[in-house]
Amino acid sequence: MCRKDVLIVLGRSLFSIAQITINNRVKYDAIAKRLHITGKHTGHTYFVERIFMDSAHNTVELNAALSNPRDDIAKLDELEKKLFAFNYAANEIGSFGPCIDPKKAAEERGEALAILGEQIQETLCDPAVGALLDRLHENRALLDETHRAQVKILRRDRSQLVDVPVELQSNFVRLTTEANEVWEQAKNSDDWSLFAPKLDSLIELRKEMCQARDASKDPYDLLLSDFEHGTNREFYNTFFNNVKEVVVPLVADCMASKRQPSTKPLEGKFDVNRQWDLAKDLVKIQGLDEDAYWLGKTEHPYTGGPGIGFVMVASHAYENNVLSNVYSMLHENGHALYEQGINWEYRFTSLSTGTSMGMHESQSRFFENYVGLSEAFAEPLIQLMRKHFPGQLNRVTAFQLFSAANKVQPSLIRTEADELTYPLHILIRYEMEQALLSGEITAKDVPALWAEKYKQYLGVTVPTNTEGALQDVHWSWGEFGYFPTYALGSAYGAQYKHAMIAEGMDFDAVCASGDLAPIREWLGSRIWTWGRAKDSKELILGACGEPFDVHYYTKYLTDKYSRIYGLASA
C-alpha cells in the first residue's frame, strides 16, 4: 500500500496555503483610479463602494476584474512551495513515525499531525485562497498545462475540506493515530474487543465528515471517489460482478484439477537477515534510485516518504515464508518507482505524487504480479534467491518457483493470497465496508460476518481475529474505500501489459533478462511522469489507446491459470 498518498487523501492533503489578504480600500482605490474617479461622492464611487459592501461573491468578481494573470500565477507558484513544505513535514511524520518511533511517541505524533491539519485546513479553506483559485480557473486558457493541472487539483482538494469543520478533521487525525496503536495491540493479542470501539468511532466520524461535505451523496460513494476519482458503488458493483463471474468458477476448476503445483521446494526456514539482503537486491533489479530510497521494517508493508527525492518502503520478513517478503518488496517497490518517476519539474507542487490509489496500486501490483509472478521472471528471481540461500535453493528450478508462487490456494491472509483468489479477498472487504458505512452492521458484528463471507467466497474457516478482520491496517487509519483500488489496480495492469505487447515489446523476454528498463520506460513515460496532472481515465486512455476495460483482466487470469492447471479453455 502507498502510505504517502493515503496521507494526502485523508488530510486532503495537509496542504498549507498562505493567506492572501488585500485591503478593500486598496481595491477600491485601484478601481476608482481605473474609472478615473476623482470626486468621492460621484455615482461611480457609490457604485464601487456598494459592490464592496455587498457579498463575498462580488468580492470574487472584483478580484477577477483587478487580477493580472501573471501576478496570480506568481502567487500560485509561491504558494505551492509552501504547500510542499507542509506536505513534506506531514508525510515525514506520518510515514516514518509508525516505522521508527517508539510506542510512547504515538500520542505526540498524532497531536503534531492534528495541529498541522488544523492550520493547513484553515489556510486552504480561506475565502481569499478560493478566490485566487477561482480567478485562475476562469483564466485557465491563459495558463500553461502544468499550472492548469495545479489549479484543477487544488480546487478539488479544497472542495473536499471547505465544508468540514476544522475540529472534526483534527479529531479524525488524532483518532486514527490512537486507533492504529490499539489495532496493533488487538492484532497481536487476537482481541477484537480492543479495536471495536475505535472502529465504531472512526465510522461515525467518517460519516459525519461526509455529511458535512455533501449530504446529498452516500458517504461510501464519496470515500470511494476520494481514493479513485470518479468511482462509486455503481462502478465497483459492475466491476466486481464482472470479476466474480470469471474468478469464482475458475478457482473451483483449478482446485478440482489433477494438475496441482507444489509449494514444497520453497518451504522451510529462511534466515531473516539474509532475507533483508535479498530485499536490497530486489531494489537493484527493479531499478530504483537508491539515493532517493529508504528501506525499513514494519508489521504491515507500506510505501511513504515526503517527496520525489525521498521515498521510503517498509516491509516484513517471516522465517517460515521466504516468498512473503519477496513479493511484498516487489509490490512496495512498484509504488516507490511511481513516486520516483514523477516529473522532476513537479517538485514543490501539488502534482508531485501519484494521481490516485487505483493508479498507485496498478503500479505495485504490476511489478508484483505481471512481472514478479510471470514464468519468465522466475529465472532471474531464483538466481537472486540462490545467491542468498545457496544451500536451500540450489536445486530449486525457475519452474518450481513459478509453480509454487502461483498455486491457487484459498486462504485467510490477503497479502499472502495467490493472484487468482486475491480479488475475492478485496470483494469481501468491499462488501464489509458497505455494510459498516450504511449502518447495516457495527463493529461488534464484523468478526461473524467476516467469517461468513470467507466461508462463502473462499471456503475457508477463520480461526482467529488476527487471521481475520484484524489482519489489515487500513481501517485503523480510517481508510474506508481504499481496498477496492487493489483489485482495480490489478485490472489496470492487464491492460498495460496488453498495450506493451501490442506496441511490439517482447514482454517475456524483458522479464527473463532481468533488465526491466523497457517496462520502466514504458510506464514512466505514460504514467509516472504525469504525477497528479492527469486522472486515471486520462492516463489509461493515453497509455493504452482506449478506456479501461475489465475484460483484459479476466482474460489474463483465465489464460494464465488455465495453462498452469491444464484446463480446457487454455
Question: What are the functions of these language-model segments?
Answer:
Residues 35-37:
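Short linear proline/tyrosine/threonine-rich motifs used for host-factor recruitment
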Residues 172-322, 519, 546:
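Contiguous, non-catalytic segments that form substrate-binding/exosite surfaces or channel walls
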Residues 327-340, 361-365:
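Active-site recognition of the HExxH zinc-binding catalytic motif
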Residues 353-393:
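Post-HExxH zinc-binding segment in Zn-dependent metallohydrolases
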Residues 54-57, 62-72, 94, 104, ...:
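C-terminal, non-catalytic "cap/extension" segments appended to globular domains
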Residues 6-9, 29-30, 42-48:
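Short hydrophobic alpha-helical segments enriched in small aliphatic residues
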Residues 54-229, 558-570:
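A well-structured
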